[in-house]
A protein has these predicted regions:
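N-terminal export/assembly segments and adjacent metallocofactor-ligating motifs
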Residues: 2-304, 331, 459, 480, ...
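Phosphate/diphosphate-binding loops
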Residues: 506-507, 552-571
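A glycine-rich phosphate-binding loop feature that marks nucleotide/adenosyl-phosphate handling sites
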Residues: 170, 311-315, 367, 410-421, ...
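Long, contiguous, secondary-structure-rich segments that constitute the structural scaffold
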Residues: 563-615, 701-703, 707-718, 722-807
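Extended redox/cofactor-interaction regions of prokaryotic respiratory oxidoreductases
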Residues: 2-11, 181-251, 257-259, 263-264, ...
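Short beta-alpha connecting loops at secondary-structure transitions
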Residues: 276-282, 545-556
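Long, well-ordered, tryptophan-enriched scaffold segments
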Residues: 267-370
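Active-site phosphate/pyrophosphate-binding segments
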Residues: 327-453
Length: 807
């Protein structure tokens, strides 16, 4: 049913303001319907409603965007009356062309008015008056706040050097004039800062993909998905994590063109509900085992593309091993059990995965006999103890079946698109960071705790010859627009102890809109405005060839300022104001400059500045025959080699072999039992696996405090009826979930949409401990580990064992 066919709902949407009741009803009505109607031209969209609102009074409809890190970048329309946002709609007033689809927002973006006008917005600068983490603050003036920040920056630089200053990883800004980039620019102009590499989203897949292909650009335009006949959605849930605006639309179009879609996931996700022909539940952390068993089927049943593995790949069998490793274990030998005595049969994999052997064999045959086919990996499966292995195994299966370099195929891995999925952008001129050192982003707490002891074995980069460790630990933390300082970091109880110790990080400054769990550890909090209260620009996540303008919709509320304006004030105290602002440019000056640059340099895409500004967004239209990743390599591997050391698809990686850590970093992808798993000692006390998915309630932790979203998508632990019955738990019961790292008490959602033995606690809820330190809101990071993965040194926050009981 189209939402436009419901007269009562239409009447509610016609109201000049959208009430909480209407939002909840609308979100419920569209929760499943959105999957059926997403990006389809729906009876003129909502444009008549916008016209009716504009005709009803002095209402201005201002095109803007949704600039948070959900995976999409959608268009919003802010309806403003007397300087107040009274309504949010989306991209519905232009043709919905399959080659240029509308950029429609989900309920997250449509609830944004409640964020702008939330009663708990920070209104003025704050100075800590109690212990770090206590949330005790007093209001101070902007002058006193920025003076304090500048004084501490100067003190730490003079005492320890610039490498003691750290601009924390953060993704809450989303706009060119907001977020961590504004702080990084400030600190780089101030002489530099300790850098970081990797991120919390895809550390393992970023590192593992190039070990096979030599590049991260292994994907192609989403339009090419329409050429596929089979799509394996392996831990991939675009309906909730988005993975680029309109990704659901392209999967739907592929299905309409005849593709079969199979979701392999512990959860019966929204994607499984609306986009899949079949759901295969699988135990978390065992995806590599199922893939290995599929490879066994391909090998033993003669379904290997022999030409591909012989011509384009390295290390499949003993006849195609690299020089110097002729006697090393080949991939085929591992799969057949010739080297370890354990054939990776479907029956072997069933014991680990919980997937019936017959099902594994059937999926292996389908993938081996249906061409072209896609194996699309989601990123949750690589945020695990040995996340690099599932990425590499997922890249090998396309090689075994010859699904690389052909229309409708998919090389897998991180899959940044080659051609057809980018739009020209603009931003601040880059500034060199004079500090050469960087650390893995997920190990920042180690750099606070023991930075002066961290060396190359800890992932430190940039050490000169003769330097063994960092010269100092982090002494000043600068966190702009992010909640990874505490809330989104692993093992929050350990993290808060480190942050609370003022002998370690001596000063912490935070730009924030709310008193988040991370902000509570700041010595000074600088209140930031939302992107609707300043100028900026956003665009292109992984997929989506779009650029969305973010004009100022309303004036900044209270005493808030943009992240850029805040950094400019500090720059003035540091004597680098002119350098930071390039002679005093405001956010609006930069905004106009970027528009002029884009429209001058890319007139064919954006048109002139006036037209681009009026429309508010622009998408590079898709071409009907988009480029295919690695097509030139397949056409001539000698003339167009890959950028791997061998120039081939490296099933066996000599670079990994040379690391000589075969138990954790094997040269060929292998299934490795995780350190927290049903087969580890932890399972005796904590028998349930736990995961934390992206949730429609929020964007990571952004929007967690928004009342409408809280009611529409309450935080609960999702538990299978079998596990609930065993524990005497019924729907809605308050339950305690715990392990050695921490505990929480939240309501239970008893549902067959998660497999037995697994519970799901949606990630991003704000850590809210009671007097006993038990979290009462459901922050999954009270249960997660800070231990990094072995190769990428990335986050492993999906690997945890827990127990659940009724309270």
């Amino acid at each position: 049913m189209s939402i436009h066919e419901d007269t009562n709902l239409l009447n509610q949407l016609n109201q000049a303001t959208l009430s909480r009741r209407s939002f909840l009803q609308w979100s419920a009505a569209t929760g499943a319907a959105a999957l059926l109607t997403s990006n389809v031209n729906l009876v003129n969209g909502l444009y008549p409603l916008e016209q009716a609102l504009a005709a009803a009074g002095d209402i201005q409809v201002i095109p803007t965007g949704c600039a948070h890190n959900c995976g999409g970048r959608c268009v919003l329309k802010a309806h403003v009356q007397d300087g107040i946002i009274i309504r949010i709609t989306s991209d519905t007033d232009r043709p919905d062309d399959p080659l240029d689809p509308q950029l429609r927002a989900c309920v997250r973006g449509r609830s944004y008015r409640r964020r702008v006008y939330a009663p708990d917005r920070l209104k003025s600068p704050l100075r800590r008056t109690g212990p770090r983490g206590s949330g005790l603050y007093e209001e101070i003036s902007w002058e006193e706040a920025v003076d304090t920040v500048a004084e501490n920056l100067i003190r730490v630089k003079e005492t320890y050097g610039n490498s003691a200053i750290y601009s924390h990883y953060a993704t809450g800004g989303g706009s060119t004039t907001a977020g961590s980039g504004t702080a990084a620019r400030l600190l780089d102009l101030f002489g530099g800062r300790l850098g970081y590499y990797n991120n919390y989203s895809w550390a393992c897949v970023q590192v593992a993909t190039p070990t096979v292909y030599g590049t991260q650009n292994t994907g192609q335009s989403r339009l090419d998905w329409l050429n596929s006949k089979l799509i394996l959605m392996w831990g991939w849930n675009p309906a909730e994590m988005i993975d680029g605006t309109n990704t659901m639309y392209f999967v739907k179009q592929a299905r309409a063109a005849g593709a079969k879609t199979i979701v392999i996931d512990p959860r019966h996700t929204m994607s499984a509900v609306g986009l899949a022909d079949e759901w295969i539940p699988i135990r978390p952390g065992t995806d590599t085992a199922m893939m290995a068993a599929m490879a066994y089927v391909l090998i033993t049943e003669g379904l290997i593309d022999e030409n591909f593995v012989n011509t384009y790949a390295l290390g499949f069998d003993a006849d195609h091993m690299p020089a110097g490793y002729e006697n090393a274990e080949s991939f085929k030998a591992y799969i057949l059990g010739e080297s370890d005595g354990v054939p990776k049969t479907p029956a072997w994999a069933e014991e680990y995965t919980g997937v019936p052997a017959d099902t594994i064999a059937r999926i292996g045959r389908e993938y081996g006999t249906t061409k072209p086919a896609m194996l699309y990996q989601g990123y949750g499966i690589q945020r695990r103890a040995y996340g690099e292995q599932v990425v590499r195994m997922g890249c090998v299966l396309p090689a075994l079946t010859g699904n690389i370099g052909i229309p409708g195929g998919w090389a897998s891995g991180i899959a940044f698109a080659i051609g057809g999925e980018s739009a020209p952008g603009a931003g601040f001129p880059s500034v060199a960071n004079a500090v050469p050192y960087s650390v893995p982003s997920y190990m920042y707490t180690d750099a606070v705790l023991r930075g002066a002891e961290m060396g190359r074995a800890d992932g430190v980069r940039g050490l000169a010859e003769g330097e063994e460790t960092l010269p100092t630990g982090i002494k000043l933390l600068y966190n702009a627009a992010g909640n990874c300082l505490a809330n989104q970091h692993g093992n929050i109880n350990r993290t808060k102890e480190i942050l609370a110790d003022e002998s370690l990080a001596e000063f912490i400054v935070v730009h924030e809109q709310f008193l988040t769990p991370s902000a509570k550890f700041a010595d000074i909090i600088l209140p930031a405005c939302t992107f609707m209260e300043t100028f900026g620009m956003t665009g292109n996540w992984k997929y989506g060839p779009s650029r969305v303008l973010l004009p100022k919709v309303i004036e900044p509320l209270y005493g808030t300022k943009s992240d850029y304006a805040i950094a400019a004030m500090i720059a003035e105290r540091l004597g680098i104001y002119d350098e930071y602002t390039e002679g005093g440019k405001t956010e609006e000056d930069w905004y106009n400059q970027w528009i002029q640059t884009l429209t001058t340099d890319n007139a064919a895409v954006y048109g002139d500045a006036e037209a681009f500004t009026a429309r508010g967004s622009m998408t590079v239209p898709y071409t009907e025959n988009p480029p295919v990743a690695f097509a030139d390599f397949i056409a001539d591997p000698v003339a167009n080699p890959l950028t791997t050391p061998s120039g081939l698809v490296e099933i066996f990686s000599p670079a990994l072999a040379a690391m000589n850590k075969p138990e954790e970093i094997p040269a060929i992808p292998k299934f490795i039992v995780e350190w927290d798993s049903p087969w580890s000692p932890e399972a005796e006390n904590y028998p349930l696996q736990a995961i934390g998915n992206h949730y429609m309630h929020r964007v990571h932790s952004t929007l967690d405090n928004i009342d409408w979203m809280d009611e529409a998508f309450p935080q609960r632990v999702f538990i299978n009826p079998a596990d609930a019955t065993e524990r005497g738990i019924q729907e809605g019961d308050m339950v305690r979930i715990w392990n050695d790292r921490g505990a929480m008490i939240i309501p239970a959602r008893v549902t067959p949409r998660i497999m037995p033995g697994v519970v799901n606690i949606p990630q991003g809820a704000w850590y809210t401990p009671d007097a006993d330190g038990v979290d009462r809101r459901g922050c999954v990071n009270v249960l997660t580990s800070e231990r990094p993965s072995p190769l990428a040194l990335g986050n492993t926050q999906q690997t945890m064992m827990v127990q659940v009981e009724k309270v």
